[in-house]
Amino acid sequence: MRYSLLKILTEGLTGNRGWPPVWREPEPKTDYDVVIVGAGGHGLATAYYLAKEFGITNVAVLEKGWLGSGNIGRNTTIIRSNYLLPGNEPFYEFSMKLWEGLEQDFNYNAMVSQRGVLNLGHSDAQRDAFARRGNAMRLAGSDAVLLDTEAVREMCPFLDFDNARFPIKGGLWQPRGGTVRHDAVAWGYARGADSRGVDIIQNCEVTGFQIENGICRGVETTRGKIRAKKVAVCVAGSSGRVMEKAGMRLPIESHVLQAFVSEGLKPVIPGVITFGAGHFYVSQSDKGGLVFGGDLDGYNSYAQRGNLPVVEDVCEGGMAIMPMIGRARLLRMWGGIMDMSMDGSPFIDKTDIGGLYFNGGWCYGGFKATPASGYCYAHLLARDEPHPTAAAYRLDRFRRGAMIDEKGQGAQPNLH
Protein backbone atom coordinates (compact mmCIF):
# COMPACT_ATOMS: atom_id res chain seq x y z
CA MET A 1 0.00 0.00 0.00
CA ARG A 2 1.19 3.49 -0.87
CA TYR A 3 0.48 6.12 1.77
CA SER A 4 -1.05 9.38 0.59
CA LEU A 5 -3.30 12.21 1.75
CA LEU A 6 -6.20 10.63 -0.15
CA LYS A 7 -5.64 7.31 1.65
CA ILE A 8 -5.61 9.05 5.05
CA LEU A 9 -8.86 10.87 4.27
CA THR A 10 -10.49 7.69 2.98
CA GLU A 11 -9.53 5.68 6.05
CA GLY A 12 -10.63 8.49 8.35
CA LEU A 13 -14.09 8.45 6.78
CA THR A 14 -14.39 4.64 6.90
CA GLY A 15 -13.27 3.97 10.47
CA ASN A 16 -9.61 3.17 9.72
CA ARG A 17 -10.48 -0.44 8.93
CA GLY A 18 -8.44 -0.72 5.74
CA TRP A 19 -4.89 -0.35 7.06
CA PRO A 20 -2.86 -3.56 6.55
CA PRO A 21 0.04 -4.54 8.86
CA VAL A 22 3.13 -2.45 8.13
CA TRP A 23 5.30 -5.57 7.86
CA ARG A 24 4.83 -9.34 7.96
CA GLU A 25 5.78 -11.78 10.74
CA PRO A 26 7.37 -14.55 8.64
CA GLU A 27 8.88 -17.82 9.83
CA PRO A 28 12.60 -18.14 9.03
CA LYS A 29 13.52 -20.15 5.96
CA THR A 30 16.37 -22.64 6.00
CA ASP A 31 18.63 -20.61 3.71
CA TYR A 32 19.05 -17.09 2.34
CA ASP A 33 21.43 -15.21 0.11
CA VAL A 34 22.16 -12.73 2.92
CA VAL A 35 21.45 -12.90 6.64
CA ILE A 36 21.69 -9.58 8.50
CA VAL A 37 22.17 -9.82 12.26
CA GLY A 38 20.48 -6.89 13.98
CA ALA A 39 17.18 -5.19 13.09
CA GLY A 40 18.20 -1.72 14.14
CA GLY A 41 18.51 1.28 11.86
CA HIS A 42 21.66 0.07 10.10
CA GLY A 43 20.46 -3.49 9.63
CA LEU A 44 17.07 -2.47 8.27
CA ALA A 45 18.62 0.18 6.02
CA THR A 46 21.05 -2.42 4.66
CA ALA A 47 18.20 -4.80 3.87
CA TYR A 48 16.20 -2.00 2.23
CA TYR A 49 19.03 -0.89 -0.05
CA LEU A 50 20.01 -4.48 -0.88
CA ALA A 51 16.49 -5.02 -2.19
CA LYS A 52 15.91 -1.61 -3.75
CA GLU A 53 19.29 -0.71 -5.22
CA PHE A 54 20.89 -4.10 -5.86
CA GLY A 55 17.92 -6.40 -6.45
CA ILE A 56 18.85 -8.88 -3.69
CA THR A 57 15.59 -9.81 -1.97
CA ASN A 58 16.31 -13.27 -0.52
CA VAL A 59 17.39 -11.59 2.70
CA ALA A 60 16.62 -12.17 6.38
CA VAL A 61 17.06 -9.63 9.15
CA LEU A 62 17.37 -11.34 12.54
CA GLU A 63 16.60 -9.48 15.76
CA LYS A 64 17.08 -10.79 19.30
CA GLY A 65 14.24 -8.65 20.66
CA TRP A 66 11.77 -6.55 18.77
CA LEU A 67 12.44 -4.41 15.75
CA GLY A 68 14.10 -1.10 16.64
CA SER A 69 14.59 -1.94 20.32
CA GLY A 70 18.24 -0.89 20.37
CA ASN A 71 20.03 2.38 19.75
CA ILE A 72 17.82 3.42 16.82
CA GLY A 73 15.12 4.25 19.37
CA ARG A 74 17.44 5.50 22.13
CA ASN A 75 19.35 8.37 20.51
CA THR A 76 18.73 12.12 20.55
CA THR A 77 17.57 12.14 16.89
CA ILE A 78 20.22 14.57 15.57
CA ILE A 79 21.43 14.50 11.96
CA ARG A 80 24.44 16.49 10.73
CA SER A 81 27.47 16.27 8.47
CA ASN A 82 29.85 18.72 10.16
CA TYR A 83 32.97 16.57 10.16
CA LEU A 84 36.55 17.59 9.40
CA LEU A 85 38.61 14.65 8.17
CA PRO A 86 38.46 13.45 4.54
CA GLY A 87 37.71 9.90 5.69
CA ASN A 88 34.54 11.09 7.45
CA GLU A 89 33.06 14.21 5.86
CA PRO A 90 32.20 12.79 2.39
CA PHE A 91 30.49 9.81 4.04
CA TYR A 92 28.35 11.90 6.40
CA GLU A 93 27.50 14.36 3.62
CA PHE A 94 26.34 11.39 1.54
CA SER A 95 24.19 10.39 4.49
CA MET A 96 22.75 13.91 4.75
CA LYS A 97 21.75 13.84 1.09
CA LEU A 98 20.00 10.51 1.64
CA TRP A 99 18.18 11.96 4.68
CA GLU A 100 16.88 14.80 2.54
CA GLY A 101 15.15 12.44 0.12
CA LEU A 102 14.34 9.68 2.58
CA GLU A 103 10.62 10.23 3.12
CA GLN A 104 9.83 10.37 -0.59
CA ASP A 105 12.12 7.41 -1.17
CA PHE A 106 10.38 4.95 1.15
CA ASN A 107 6.95 6.66 1.30
CA TYR A 108 6.91 7.12 5.05
CA ASN A 109 6.80 10.22 7.24
CA ALA A 110 10.06 10.21 9.19
CA MET A 111 9.54 13.83 10.30
CA VAL A 112 12.86 15.06 8.86
CA SER A 113 13.26 18.57 10.27
CA GLN A 114 16.25 20.51 8.93
CA ARG A 115 16.25 23.42 11.37
CA GLY A 116 20.02 23.66 11.63
CA VAL A 117 22.79 22.59 14.01
CA LEU A 118 24.68 25.31 15.90
CA ASN A 119 28.02 24.49 17.56
CA LEU A 120 28.93 27.20 20.07
CA GLY A 121 32.53 28.44 20.34
CA HIS A 122 33.99 29.88 23.53
CA SER A 123 37.57 30.90 22.70
CA ASP A 124 39.65 32.33 19.90
CA ALA A 125 41.26 28.94 19.33
CA GLN A 126 37.86 27.28 19.03
CA ARG A 127 36.71 29.92 16.56
CA ASP A 128 39.79 29.22 14.42
CA ALA A 129 39.10 25.48 14.62
CA PHE A 130 35.51 26.10 13.52
CA ALA A 131 36.74 28.12 10.55
CA ARG A 132 38.99 25.23 9.55
CA ARG A 133 36.19 22.70 9.98
CA GLY A 134 33.72 24.85 8.06
CA ASN A 135 36.13 25.19 5.15
CA ALA A 136 36.67 21.42 5.09
CA MET A 137 32.91 20.89 5.08
CA ARG A 138 32.42 23.28 2.17
CA LEU A 139 35.24 21.67 0.21
CA ALA A 140 33.39 18.36 0.59
CA GLY A 141 30.17 19.88 -0.77
CA SER A 142 28.46 20.47 2.55
CA ASP A 143 27.15 23.73 4.01
CA ALA A 144 28.67 25.72 6.86
CA VAL A 145 28.32 29.27 8.16
CA LEU A 146 30.77 30.83 10.64
CA LEU A 147 28.87 33.12 13.01
CA ASP A 148 30.13 35.87 15.30
CA THR A 149 28.70 36.60 18.74
CA GLU A 150 26.03 39.00 17.50
CA ALA A 151 24.79 36.56 14.88
CA VAL A 152 24.48 33.85 17.54
CA ARG A 153 22.69 36.32 19.85
CA GLU A 154 20.20 37.16 17.11
CA MET A 155 19.55 33.47 16.44
CA CYS A 156 19.40 32.35 20.10
CA PRO A 157 18.79 35.34 22.40
CA PHE A 158 17.98 33.07 25.35
CA LEU A 159 21.60 31.90 25.74
CA ASP A 160 23.71 33.34 28.56
CA PHE A 161 25.80 36.01 26.85
CA ASP A 162 26.39 38.25 29.86
CA ASN A 163 27.38 36.09 32.82
CA ALA A 164 28.57 32.81 31.35
CA ARG A 165 31.70 31.21 32.77
CA PHE A 166 32.67 30.39 29.18
CA PRO A 167 31.74 33.45 27.07
CA ILE A 168 30.13 32.76 23.70
CA LYS A 169 32.54 33.95 21.00
CA GLY A 170 30.51 32.73 18.03
CA GLY A 171 29.61 29.44 16.45
CA LEU A 172 29.58 27.15 13.43
CA TRP A 173 26.14 26.66 11.93
CA GLN A 174 25.07 23.95 9.52
CA PRO A 175 21.65 25.02 8.20
CA ARG A 176 20.85 21.58 6.71
CA GLY A 177 21.36 19.73 9.98
CA GLY A 178 18.45 18.98 12.26
CA THR A 179 16.44 16.13 13.74
CA VAL A 180 14.49 13.08 12.55
CA ARG A 181 11.90 10.94 14.34
CA HIS A 182 14.09 7.94 15.13
CA ASP A 183 11.35 5.31 15.54
CA ALA A 184 9.85 6.31 12.19
CA VAL A 185 13.22 5.70 10.53
CA ALA A 186 13.20 2.09 11.75
CA TRP A 187 9.56 1.59 10.79
CA GLY A 188 10.00 3.18 7.36
CA TYR A 189 13.02 1.07 6.47
CA ALA A 190 11.31 -2.07 7.81
CA ARG A 191 8.18 -1.38 5.78
CA GLY A 192 10.19 -0.68 2.63
CA ALA A 193 12.34 -3.80 3.00
CA ASP A 194 9.38 -6.03 3.84
CA SER A 195 7.39 -4.81 0.83
CA ARG A 196 10.30 -5.91 -1.38
CA GLY A 197 10.35 -9.44 0.00
CA VAL A 198 12.85 -9.19 2.86
CA ASP A 199 12.03 -11.38 5.91
CA ILE A 200 12.26 -9.48 9.21
CA ILE A 201 12.40 -12.10 11.96
CA GLN A 202 11.97 -10.79 15.49
CA ASN A 203 12.69 -12.66 18.75
CA CYS A 204 15.40 -14.66 16.99
CA GLU A 205 18.75 -14.48 18.79
CA VAL A 206 21.95 -15.51 17.02
CA THR A 207 23.76 -17.98 19.29
CA GLY A 208 26.63 -18.92 16.97
CA PHE A 209 28.05 -19.00 13.47
CA GLN A 210 28.39 -21.98 11.16
CA ILE A 211 32.04 -21.71 10.09
CA GLU A 212 33.44 -24.43 7.83
CA ASN A 213 37.06 -24.34 6.60
CA GLY A 214 37.37 -20.63 7.37
CA ILE A 215 34.12 -19.68 5.61
CA CYS A 216 30.91 -18.61 7.31
CA ARG A 217 28.05 -20.72 5.95
CA GLY A 218 25.24 -19.45 8.17
CA VAL A 219 24.12 -18.79 11.72
CA GLU A 220 22.72 -20.75 14.64
CA THR A 221 19.72 -19.12 16.29
CA THR A 222 17.13 -19.76 18.98
CA ARG A 223 14.77 -20.63 16.12
CA GLY A 224 17.06 -23.08 14.37
CA LYS A 225 19.98 -23.06 11.97
CA ILE A 226 19.88 -20.75 8.96
CA ARG A 227 22.26 -21.13 6.03
CA ALA A 228 23.44 -18.08 4.11
CA LYS A 229 25.90 -17.19 1.40
CA LYS A 230 26.80 -14.05 3.32
CA VAL A 231 26.32 -13.05 6.96
CA ALA A 232 26.33 -9.34 7.83
CA VAL A 233 26.65 -8.30 11.47
CA CYS A 234 25.52 -4.84 12.65
CA VAL A 235 24.59 -4.99 16.31
CA ALA A 236 26.10 -1.73 17.66
CA GLY A 237 27.07 -2.04 21.33
CA SER A 238 26.74 -5.84 21.27
CA SER A 239 29.35 -6.15 18.49
CA GLY A 240 32.05 -7.58 20.75
CA ARG A 241 29.81 -10.27 22.23
CA VAL A 242 28.37 -11.35 18.87
CA MET A 243 31.66 -11.39 16.96
CA GLU A 244 33.27 -13.33 19.81
CA LYS A 245 30.97 -16.21 18.81
CA ALA A 246 32.90 -16.27 15.52
CA GLY A 247 36.24 -16.24 17.35
CA MET A 248 37.00 -12.59 16.58
CA ARG A 249 38.19 -9.78 18.84
CA LEU A 250 37.39 -6.24 17.76
CA PRO A 251 39.10 -2.88 18.46
CA ILE A 252 35.86 -1.77 20.15
CA GLU A 253 34.66 -1.20 23.70
CA SER A 254 31.03 -0.95 24.83
CA HIS A 255 29.97 2.04 26.93
CA VAL A 256 26.61 3.39 28.04
CA LEU A 257 25.46 6.81 26.83
CA GLN A 258 22.53 8.46 28.57
CA ALA A 259 19.90 10.72 27.03
CA PHE A 260 17.21 12.83 28.66
CA VAL A 261 13.94 14.58 27.89
CA SER A 262 12.27 17.32 29.91
CA GLU A 263 8.62 18.10 30.41
CA GLY A 264 6.93 19.87 27.50
CA LEU A 265 7.77 23.57 27.12
CA LYS A 266 6.75 26.32 24.72
CA PRO A 267 8.83 26.41 21.51
CA VAL A 268 12.15 28.09 22.25
CA ILE A 269 15.06 26.23 20.65
CA PRO A 270 15.11 26.70 16.86
CA GLY A 271 17.22 23.66 15.98
CA VAL A 272 20.11 21.85 17.65
CA ILE A 273 22.58 23.62 19.95
CA THR A 274 25.84 22.17 21.28
CA PHE A 275 27.99 23.53 24.13
CA GLY A 276 31.61 23.94 23.05
CA ALA A 277 33.21 24.21 26.50
CA GLY A 278 31.65 20.99 27.77
CA HIS A 279 29.70 18.15 26.23
CA PHE A 280 26.04 19.06 26.02
CA TYR A 281 23.68 19.03 23.04
CA VAL A 282 20.00 19.87 22.98
CA SER A 283 17.04 20.13 20.63
CA GLN A 284 13.30 20.50 21.19
CA SER A 285 10.82 17.85 20.16
CA ASP A 286 7.44 18.43 18.54
CA LYS A 287 5.85 17.79 21.94
CA GLY A 288 7.92 20.59 23.46
CA GLY A 289 10.30 18.46 25.50
CA LEU A 290 13.99 19.35 25.53
CA VAL A 291 15.91 16.32 24.27
CA PHE A 292 19.53 16.42 25.40
CA GLY A 293 22.61 14.41 26.29
CA GLY A 294 26.31 14.64 27.04
CA ASP A 295 29.24 12.37 27.81
CA LEU A 296 29.47 8.63 28.22
CA ASP A 297 29.36 7.17 31.71
CA GLY A 298 33.04 6.37 31.20
CA TYR A 299 33.14 2.70 32.20
CA ASN A 300 32.44 -0.43 30.18
CA SER A 301 28.82 -1.53 30.36
CA TYR A 302 26.16 -3.47 28.49
CA ALA A 303 23.33 -1.98 30.57
CA GLN A 304 20.81 0.29 28.83
CA ARG A 305 20.80 2.61 31.81
CA GLY A 306 23.37 4.89 33.42
CA ASN A 307 24.34 6.42 36.74
CA LEU A 308 23.63 9.72 38.50
CA PRO A 309 27.02 11.52 38.22
CA VAL A 310 26.53 11.90 34.47
CA VAL A 311 23.01 13.25 35.05
CA GLU A 312 24.50 16.02 37.18
CA ASP A 313 27.30 16.70 34.70
CA VAL A 314 24.96 16.93 31.70
CA CYS A 315 22.50 19.20 33.50
CA GLU A 316 25.37 21.47 34.59
CA GLY A 317 26.36 21.81 30.94
CA GLY A 318 22.83 22.87 30.04
CA MET A 319 22.66 25.38 32.86
CA ALA A 320 26.01 26.85 31.81
CA ILE A 321 24.69 28.06 28.46
CA MET A 322 20.99 28.63 29.18
CA PRO A 323 20.10 29.05 32.86
CA MET A 324 16.45 29.52 31.92
CA ILE A 325 15.97 25.73 31.87
CA GLY A 326 16.81 25.43 35.57
CA ARG A 327 13.20 25.07 36.68
CA ALA A 328 12.22 22.57 33.99
CA ARG A 329 11.63 19.05 35.29
CA LEU A 330 13.15 15.91 33.80
CA LEU A 331 10.47 13.68 32.35
CA ARG A 332 12.56 10.57 31.73
CA MET A 333 16.03 9.34 30.89
CA TRP A 334 17.46 6.21 29.31
CA GLY A 335 20.68 4.69 28.02
CA GLY A 336 22.06 3.09 24.89
CA ILE A 337 25.11 0.87 24.41
CA MET A 338 27.76 2.62 22.32
CA ASP A 339 30.25 0.63 20.25
CA MET A 340 33.26 2.88 20.84
CA SER A 341 36.20 2.28 18.49
CA MET A 342 39.82 3.11 19.28
CA ASP A 343 39.93 6.14 16.98
CA GLY A 344 36.29 7.22 17.18
CA SER A 345 35.43 6.15 13.62
CA PRO A 346 33.39 3.18 12.34
CA PHE A 347 34.00 0.01 10.35
CA ILE A 348 32.20 -1.26 7.24
CA ASP A 349 34.31 -4.13 6.01
CA LYS A 350 34.81 -7.80 5.25
CA THR A 351 36.38 -9.92 7.97
CA ASP A 352 39.14 -12.49 7.66
CA ILE A 353 36.43 -15.17 7.76
CA GLY A 354 35.00 -15.68 4.29
CA GLY A 355 31.35 -14.70 3.92
CA LEU A 356 31.30 -12.78 7.24
CA TYR A 357 30.98 -8.98 7.17
CA PHE A 358 31.01 -6.40 9.95
CA ASN A 359 29.47 -2.97 10.46
CA GLY A 360 30.10 -1.24 13.79
CA GLY A 361 32.22 1.08 15.90
CA TRP A 362 29.88 4.04 15.34
CA CYS A 363 30.50 5.72 18.70
CA TYR A 364 28.27 8.82 18.79
CA GLY A 365 27.70 8.89 15.03
CA GLY A 366 25.42 5.92 14.46
CA PHE A 367 22.01 7.51 14.00
CA LYS A 368 23.04 10.31 11.66
CA ALA A 369 24.90 7.75 9.54
CA THR A 370 21.95 5.35 9.18
CA PRO A 371 21.10 5.87 5.47
CA ALA A 372 24.71 5.98 4.25
CA SER A 373 25.73 3.08 6.48
CA GLY A 374 22.93 0.94 5.08
CA TYR A 375 23.67 1.95 1.50
CA CYS A 376 27.43 1.38 1.79
CA TYR A 377 27.01 -1.92 3.63
CA ALA A 378 24.57 -3.10 0.97
CA HIS A 379 27.08 -2.06 -1.70
CA LEU A 380 29.80 -4.08 0.03
CA LEU A 381 27.56 -7.14 0.36
CA ALA A 382 26.31 -6.97 -3.22
CA ARG A 383 29.59 -6.21 -5.01
CA ASP A 384 32.18 -7.38 -2.49
CA GLU A 385 33.99 -4.06 -2.72
CA PRO A 386 33.65 -0.95 -0.52
CA HIS A 387 31.58 2.04 -1.54
CA PRO A 388 33.91 4.98 -2.35
CA THR A 389 32.64 7.11 0.55
CA ALA A 390 33.22 4.29 3.06
CA ALA A 391 36.55 3.05 1.72
CA ALA A 392 38.45 4.32 4.77
CA TYR A 393 36.34 2.35 7.26
CA ARG A 394 38.48 -0.79 7.17
CA LEU A 395 39.09 -3.20 10.04
CA ASP A 396 42.84 -3.28 9.36
CA ARG A 397 43.40 0.48 9.49
CA PHE A 398 45.17 0.32 12.86
CA ARG A 399 47.66 -2.19 11.50
CA ARG A 400 48.24 0.09 8.52
CA GLY A 401 48.49 3.28 10.60
CA ALA A 402 45.50 4.80 8.79
CA MET A 403 43.51 5.98 11.82
CA ILE A 404 40.61 8.44 11.43
CA ASP A 405 40.84 10.24 14.77
CA GLU A 406 38.33 13.08 14.34
CA LYS A 407 38.82 14.43 17.87
CA GLY A 408 42.56 13.77 18.15
CA GLN A 409 42.10 11.98 21.47
CA GLY A 410 44.26 8.94 20.81
CA ALA A 411 43.47 5.28 21.40
CA GLN A 412 41.08 5.69 24.33
CA PRO A 413 37.54 4.77 23.29
CA ASN A 414 35.71 6.52 26.13
CA LEU A 415 37.16 9.90 25.05
CA HIS A 416 35.83 9.88 21.47
Regions found by a protein language model. Name each.
Residues 1-34, 52-56:
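Extreme N-terminal leader/targeting segments of oxidoreductases
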Residues 39-42, 64:
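Glycine-rich Rossmann-fold phosphate-binding loop(s) that bind the pyrophosphate
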Residues 48-52, 77-79, 108-116, 215, ...:
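Active-site substrate-recognition segment that forms the wall
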Residues 51-72:
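Glycine-rich FAD pyrophosphate-binding loop
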Residues 76-158, 309, 317-319:
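Dinucleotide-binding Rossmann-like beta1-alpha1 core, especially the glycine-rich loop
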Residues 90-93, 120-129, 172-191, 201, ...:
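Short beta-strand to alpha-helix junction loop
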Residues 172-230:
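Helical element adjacent to the flavin cofactor pocket in flavoenzyme catalytic cores
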Residues 319-416:
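C-terminal catalytic lobe of FAD-dependent flavoproteins
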